[in-house]
Structures are given as C-alpha cells and as structure tokens.
Swiss-Prot record:
Tissue: Expressed by the venom duct.
Organism listed in the record: Hastula hectica (Sea snail)
Domain notes per entry: The cysteine framework is XV (C-C-CC-C-C-C-C).
Keyword tags: Disulfide bond, Secreted, Toxin
Modification(s) after translation: Contains 4 disulfide bonds.
Record GO cellular component, one term: extracellular region
Record-level Gene Ontology MF annotations: toxin activity
Name assigned to this protein: Augerpeptide hheTx4
Subcellular location field: Secreted
Primary location group: secreted
Amino acid sequence: NEVCPPGECQQYCCDLRKCKCINLSFYGLTCNCDS
C-alpha cells in the first residue's frame, strides 16, 4: 500500500483498476490493492 496525496488517489500511486483508495485516519489515503 502506498500513501497518496491527501484527498487524492492517482494512478502514479495506485492502479485504480486493481486498487481502492481507503482513508485511514493515521496514514491518510492509502491504496489497497489486490495481490
């Protein structure tokens, strides 16, 4: 899981075809990707 800029989920930090952006209060937005 890579940390994304606040409020955004971009393809450079996640593959949106495989990943969902999840907002974790401590980490901010992260990419949750299927392995």
